[in-house]
Amino acid sequence: MKKMKVDLAVIGGGPAGMAAALEAKRQGVEKVIIIERDKKLGGILQQCIHDGFGIQRFGERLAGTEYAQRFIDQIKESDIEVLLETMVIEMTPEKEIYACSGKHGMVYLTCGAIVAAMGCRERTASQVLLYGKRPAGVYTAGSVQRFINMEGYLPGKEAVILGSGDIGLIMARRMTLEGIKVKGVYEVMSSPGGLTRNIVQCLEDYEIPLTLSATVKEIHGKERIEGVTVAKLDENREVIEGTEEYIACDLLVLAVGLIPENELSKGAGIPLDAKTKGPVLDENFMTDIPGIFAAGNVSVVYDLVDYVSQSGEIAARGAAAYLSGKDRGEKESNEVVAGENVNFVVPEKIRRGEKEEVSFFLRVTKPLKKIKVEVVQNGARSEEHTSELQSPIHLVCRL
């Protein structure tokens, strides 16, 4: 067994993990290591060849691969150690990591601090209760994206997409450009799940129909999918009888949401937020276990990669403060409460006297325009913010 002792271990080499490792080095943390299960750094950005990344951070419209490469280049120039093709199988409350690697075999690390940046995973057909057989041709949007962009395969000729999340919208355009006929996008909610710019650029510009308050009722086919039955939904999301329609297709793409990947967190006994499905965090993005931090989509599914990177930097600064003894997470905390029309807020708690400025990431419960956000502290309104965005919202407040 290979044994290592590090100051900071970052689990995951995606945008959050890379940003966290680089920021930790800037904060003076000496021995930093990234543990990544894939062959390369970059995470999901490896298969994102469309543009729109980095507008806030770099002021440019970069492809996902370009965005990732900027961080990879910085890591190569640093003394950050990277373990690729290494799978973490356990993280303990004592900040120990057990991993396995084809090159090193079993790896055991004792860490001064840990940043968990494992990202998120896609919901599958079984998690959204799709009825019918289990034929070939039913894929998550991320799988289709990898097939086309990285492996050079077309998974079908005629497609139906269930869900209007951003990756599903982007793949509607991508499949159209590759010659696949996208017959429609169906969304169970009464409003689209993706960003407005993706609705316009990926659907409207290519005349791909979007049907709201609708779902796939049944999958048809035995060996290979032959078609689906779609139907309209009422306000209770129940199928409206008589609205069923059969659509022939050989590909069903599921873009039905993402779930933070927290099996390691649960194994370490870290409490999770029922709304975000990620760890409960303070303003340093430290979990309820001192010295273990969370960043990126492992804590909440962000809409923009810029926010993912920013969360990694917040966690890294918190880890550096923890390692130096400046902030060991011992002070009493106040709960952050999501008020009217707010679905959730990250962080979920603030430690008294820790900081003057705190970054909040929040999402509304329903699409809104010209948003006014009130921040109430000790019963009195301390700040008011306005935004034209529906979601996401990022606030920097002085408390």
Feature map (PLM): residue ranges:
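A Rossmann-like FAD-binding core segment of flavoenzymes
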Residues: 70-99, 176-263, 356-384
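FAD-binding core/adjacent interface of flavoenzyme oxidoreductases
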Residues: 1-11, 69-158, 234-242, 253, ...
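Helical hairpin unit composed of two closely spaced alpha helices linked by a short loop
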Residues: 280-281, 292, 311-314, 318-321
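Single conserved hydrophobic/aromatic residue that forms the stacking wall/gate
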Residues: 385-399
